[in-house]
UniProtKB/Swiss-Prot annotation:
Protein name: Fluoride-specific ion channel FluC 1
UniProt function note: Fluoride-specific ion channel. Important for reducing fluoride concentration in the cell, thus reducing its toxicity.
Source organism (scientific name): Methanosarcina acetivorans (strain ATCC 35395 / DSM 2834 / JCM 12185 / C2A)
NCBIfam families per the UniProt record, alphabetical: crcB
Gene: fluC1
Catalytic activity: fluoride(in) = fluoride(out)
GO biological process: one example: cellular detoxification of fluoride
Localisation: Cell membrane
Activity regulation statement: Na(+) is not transported, but it plays an essential structural role and its presence is essential for fluoride channel function.
MF terms in GO: fluoride channel activity; fluoride transmembrane transporter activity; metal ion binding
Length: 131
């Protein structure tokens, strides 16, 4: 039950953050789903960071990892919105924007996980140097 509560708390925070950031970014880009792209890239970066700090550096407890990854980042990122917005671009025959959205989301999100990993390794090395 405690784990479910952690996921729910993280999910609430992640959903509110996604709504806020995505809406703020999207206000300037009416014809391209940039808000969803940004939250997915940012979420991927933090997922890479948290997972590497948790799994390989032991900096987070299992409960904190669950709260952050499954709860907060699970609600912050959104495959369903990406899929819906991509389908809408397809329906509107905006094939160039559709291609850009799919390629940018996949490539930048994977690269963001990599940057999260590198950041985690650098942070862990820095923290070891302080001790």
């Amino acid at each position: 039950m405690y784990t479910i509560l952690l996921i729910g708390i993280g999910g609430f925070i992640g959903a509110v953050l996604r709504y806020s950031l995505s809406g703020w970014v999207q206000n300037s880009f009416v014809n391209f789903p940039l808000g969803t792209l940004v939250v997915n890239i940012v979420g991927s970066f933090f997922l890479g960071l948290v997972m590497y700090l948790s799994e390989y550096q032991g900096l987070f407890s299992e409960e904190t990892r669950i709260l952050l990854t499954i709860g907060l980042l699970g609600a912050f990122t959104t495959l369903s919105t990406f899929s819906y917005e991509s389908f809408r671009l397809l329906e509107s025959s905006k094939l160039m924007q559709l291609t850009m959205n799919i390629v940018a989301t996949v490539l930048f999100s994977i690269f963001a996980v990599y940057l999260g990993k590198i950041s985690a390794l650098n942070l862990a090395a820095y923290l070891r140097g302080i001790k």
